[in-house]
A protein has these predicted regions:
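Aromatic- and glycine-rich peptidoglycan recognition patches
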Residues: 34, 39-42, 46, 54-70, ...
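Residues that form generic nucleotide/phosphate-binding pockets
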Residues: 51
């Protein structure tokens, strides 16, 4: 789904053309009938992750080199960054949407080296093992 975004802003996250990590994901899915349990306001990333677990909407193996190299992750899948002591579900503090793959070249054996393209356009590296949902 196309969501026009201009600026990152947590206070203005639900206004048109503004977003933070969870409202970007929610706005994209909301237009297609998925609202992560909240019809009118984007939940925080941890609550989105909890919804994915409760509704059995997880990708086996999560964010892993095997899932990337074997192209098991789909555009629209969402990665939840965990590990903070923030009192939220599984310590989730960030969510990113996958939009596709990046091709880095070939290794010495001729196998493609792939990475993930994120909806924010940033080429970030996230630690492997993060939870991935497929709403």
């Amino acid at each position: 789904s196309n969501v026009t975004i201009d600026k990152t802003s947590q206070p203005k996250r639900m206004q048109e053309k503004f977003y933070d990590c969870s409202s970007l994901v929610w706005k994209s899915y909301h237009k297609n009938g998925v609202n992560f349990g909240m019809a009118y306001y984007a939940p925080v990333a941890a609550d989105m992750g909890k919804w994915c677990v409760q509704h059995k909407k997880l990708v086996s193996g999560g964010l892993s080199q095997a899932n990337i190299q074997n192209m098991k992750l789909n555009p629209g899948d969402v990665m939840f960054e965990t590990g903070q002591k923030n009192g939220r579900y599984k310590g989730i503090y960030h969510v990113e949407m996958i939009t596709g793959y990046l091709f880095y070249g070939f290794d010495g054996n001729g196998k493609a080296e792939l990475g993930i393209q994120w909806a924010t356009g940033d080429e970030k590296y996230y630690p492997m093992g993060q939870m991935v949902g497929r709403p």
